[in-house]
UniProtKB/Swiss-Prot annotation:
Name of the protein described by the UniProt record: Peptide deformylase
InterPro entries: Peptide_deformylase (IPR023635), Peptide_deformylase_sf (IPR036821)
Biological classification of the source: Bacteria, Bacillati, Bacillota, Bacilli, Lactobacillales
Reaction(s) this enzyme catalyzes, per UniProt: N-terminal N-formyl-L-methionyl-[peptide] + H2O = N-terminal L-methionyl-[peptide] + formate
Biological processes annotated in GO: co-translational protein modification; translation
Job of this protein: Removes the formyl group from the N-terminal Met of newly synthesized proteins. Requires at least a dipeptide for an efficient rate of reaction. N-terminal L-methionine is a prerequisite for activity but the enzyme has broad specificity at other positions.
Length: 186
């Protein structure tokens, strides 16, 4: 399992690189990477385990964040509905956003990142809806439509695979500026 000491911090060149495509079938090393990325999220979202291991809670973790420049990320969006189901959970490999809404969305609280220790205030404009194509750990192709928070989380993680950090999207002169029609997500 990854610990906070394993998370690469802002300033490390791997966070600014274009990650390499992952080949199938997955090597044992890539299978372990996928397992460890998801395990971090599962453990970090359990308050007792998070405290025990000194983790910061996360909803996404990309391979470059642990020093591996490959197009792989884990996403575990916590349940918001009473049924207890996550709106999106998977290890996404070689993900591509194949369509996106014109409608922009942003989190009211801004975004954070396990690789960025400082608070960077401001709205991070993203697409409110996306269609995502990716492969899972078994090499099966998936295409899913996501909106609101799950769409934002996936865009954040995919940015990591292309050497982009969330604060690159913030308007430097007016960090809290937004279009009138931007959807603000709690």
């Amino acid at each position: 399992m990854f610990l906070m000491k394993d998370i690469v911090r802002d300033g490390d060149p791997v966070l600014r690189q274009e990650a390499a495509d992952v080949t199938f079938p997955l090597s044992e090393e890539d299978q372990q990477l996928a397992k460890d990325l998801m395990e971090y999220l599962v453990v970090s979202q359990d308050p007792e385990q998070c405290k025990k291991y000194g983790l910061r809670a996360g909803v996404g973790l990309a391979a470059p964040q642990v020093g591996v420049s490959k197009k792989m990320a884990s996403v575990l969006v916590p349940p918001v509905e009473e049924d207890g189901k996550s709106p999106f959970t998977d290890v996404i490999i070689n993900p591509v956003i194949i369509s996106e809404s014109v409608q922009a969305g942003a989190l009211t609280e801004g975004e954070g990142c396990l690789s960025v220790d400082k608070d960077v205030p401001g709205f991070v404009p993203r697409h409110d809806r996306i269609t995502l194509r990716y492969y899972d750990v078994n090499g099966e192709k998936h295409q899913v439509r996501l909106k609101n928070y799950p769409a934002i989380v996936c865009q954040h993680e995919i940015d990591h695979l292309h050497g982009t950090l969330f604060y690159d999207h913030i308007n430097k002169d007016q960090p809290f500026s937004r279009d009138d029609d931007m959807i603000m997500i709690e």
